[in-house]
Amino acid sequence: MSGRPNHYWRYKIIRDPLYGFIGLTRREVKLMNTEWFTRLFRIKQLSHAFLVYPGAVHTRYEHSLGTLYVADRMAVQLGLNDHEREVVRAAALLHDLGQGPFSHLFDEVFKWVDKECDHEHLTKLIIENDETIRSILKGENNNEENDIYSDVLEILTPRKRFYKNKLLADIISGGLDCDKLDYLRRDSYHAGVAYGIFDIERVLNTITKDPRGRLCILKKGKDAVENYRLGRYLMHIQVYRHHTREIADSMFLRAVKLSLYNEKLFEDGITLAEKLTPNKNSIKDFLSFYKQLDDYSIYSLLKNPASRSKELVENLERRKLLKRAVDLDLTSGGEVRDAIDRLTLANMTEEEMDGLSEKIAKRIQEPSEYVIVRRVEIPIKLFKEGEILVYDEDQNLTDDLYRISTVSYTHLTLPTTE
């Protein structure tokens, strides 16, 4: 049972289109007023999906706020104490601080310059090195606020093998976490599609922990979670991997790649690749540069007259997109019949795809920047083993949703025709 009065959690309220009024603590308001957090206003949640779904112009800012709300509902449902509740709320609010321009798309850029770096690592780096955020999390200059800095930092550490409190970490990042529960419904709402709609109230009211302290769903909530999983799968197919969005994203990535090593972009002669590599700069210089990067500033940078990217980016702004010339299905039932050819195409490296683009461009006598070969994968399965646990109170047993679901893809059959 919570010990803090209700007004502590509702120092300020903000209206949200999905959840109505969301209460915030004084500490959370301070965090939202930092430069790093307000930067999220300028980073779209779904990169270039707005070129297909014009309503999908929502940002990481409102998603972070919604994630806090869902995390809090989970914390209360699980009976967390006040300290744990504050930790998961703050971690949920800050979980996307490290996102680059056009969100997850910029993780592709980091793969080219620093394979160890992505938005999750950068979130941790920002919290560790920003004095304002660190001071707020430590509760300095406020006797009413406890120190949650170390605990927030721990559960936001990506892919850590052991967590002091695994339950808190699973609320933030897991098969059924506050991040996914918010973005599926939020993305669906703004895109104007129904694929991501599921019964979130049923899910939140049947979340529990088993006797071993693992995050689970009660057996009676299994149907709602199956609907959530199906919605996630359909959103990837219909929205996140829509071919027009993929084309726009590919044009953006090509524009960045053309400018990465251009020594004329900046007056100091340092390339964009070097500025995006933390271990080649002081952390302070890197974060100072990265803080200024958002959807708008990266476009402005790439339109530098000295860059080969200028025309590509201007075409993106005008929605003059490249067209899909060839689309090959590399599954066993697709157009590529030979198994060896399928395997070769499916396992091409990025360098090999760039080389193929160059060859095609020469053959058809087009500028190489306007020929792009890209492999598109659906990163999730309808169900995945070990992702979501179901707890049966009557039997006191915990099982894997993958094994007991009646709609798991392993059980799907098609009716025979007579």
Where are these regions (language model features)?
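Short alpha-helix carrying the canonical HExxH Zn2+-binding catalytic motif
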Residues: 86-94
